[in-house]
A protein has these predicted regions:
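Long, low-complexity segments enriched in small/aliphatic residues
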Residues: 101, 263-324
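Non-catalytic alpha/beta scaffold blocks inside enzyme catalytic domains
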Residues: 1-276, 324
Length: 324
């Protein structure tokens, strides 16, 4: 829609992909050169801006080669256009030098007064962060004592392991997680489909509805909260995931937080987050034993969740055979 309304669209990627809208510039880079190409756009922007750049940033940019005409053109468009947006995608997020890429993009956004956006591998990664469903955050992004991350959870045997809406094929650490399922004393799985690994190693399996039979909300790329309610299409007596979880919480006599109160706080939190830009202006520490990796984790767009993986028509499309 933005392109059709006259927006200038620029891409930097490791492959040429098919898009159905006008593209102003498209830089195709190998994996190792991707970091430098992003840095070169930032270097071109620093020259155009003619601002006093912090010394540590200028020294890092000076280590790069000279920007070419395309780098300069992309940088120039970020100054001449209004309401500019930089989107960081999945290729860079799975890159071994993602921290450096993120620093360059943040510096570029700061120099050009651009907004920043993140394309994540999950549809509701921001929601998980804001609701405290990650190891080092509580509700609304408040810091907390760090718990275990996904790899740490998968690398240990537990007295009790609970998987909710998660299939082994969803995990980067699938083999490690399978070992944890085998070694844990009690395994409880909430899922919409049965896998052989779950069938072999789960002690309790509780069926739940798919996303397409549920209600919920997510925060989109622009910071808007969007709601959906697929339960409206189902019979009144249909047992929802929400009712299931509520019953389990009530059995433990635990307090259930008010979702409506949370939404009110969330709106203010999002507004403040958008208004208060907090650009990263530091570079990651380079470790002496680090070595470049010339591959990135790639994804088949029709294999990212249980429903898509099981759709035979989608698996026969051209896109299902294209790694993105």
């Amino acid at each position: 829609k933005a392109a059709n309304k006259g927006a200038s669209i620029h891409f930097m990627d490791i492959a040429l992909r098919e898009y159905h809208f006008p593209i102003s510039d498209y830089i195709i880079s190998d994996t190792l050169s991707l970091v430098e190409n992003i840095g070169l756009v930032a270097k071109a922007a620093s020259t155009i801006a003619q601002l006093d750049v912090p010394q540590h940033i200028q020294e890092q940019l000076d280590k790069l080669s000279e920007p070419n005409a395309t780098h300069k053109q992309i940088a120039q468009s970020l100054f001449t256009k209004t309401n500019t947006l930089l989107l960081n995608g999945l290729v860079s997020r799975s890159h071994s030098d993602f921290s450096l890429i993120r620093s360059y993009i943040n510096i570029l956004a700061s120099l050009t007064n651009s907004n920043l956006g993140e394309l994540t591998s999950g549809a509701n990664s921001v929601g998980a962060y804001i609701t405290g469903c990650i190891p080092h955050r509580n509700l609304l992004g408040q810091s907390s004592q760090a718990g275990l991350n996904a790899l740490e959870i998968a690398s240990k045997n537990h007295d009790l392991m609970i998987l909710y809406g998660l299939e082994i094929d969803d995990c980067l650490y699938d083999q490690i997680l399978t070992k944890a399922l085998k070694g844990s004393k009690k395994v409880v799985v909430f899922n919409s489909f049965m896998e052989s690994v779950i069938n072999d190693h789960a002690d309790i399996v509780i069926p739940i509805n798919t996303t397409y039979e549920s209600k919920g909300s997510f925060i989109n790329l622009t910071g808007q909260v969007q709601d959906f309610n697929q339960e409206l299409l189902l019979p009144n007596h249909y047992y929802s995931n929400e009712a299931l979880l509520t019953d389990l919480v009530n059995e433990r006599d635990l307090d259930i937080p008010s979702f409506n109160d949370f939404i009110k706080e969330l709106e203010s939190f999002i507004d403040q987050s958008i208004a208060n830009r907090n650009y990263i202006k530091e570079f990651p520490v380079k470790t002496s034993n680090s070595s470049p990796i010339d591959t990135t984790n790639t994804f088949n767009m029709y294999s990212i969740d249980a429903i898509l993986r099981r759709s035979r028509p989608l698996q026969q499309t051209k896109e299902s055979r294209t790694i993105t």
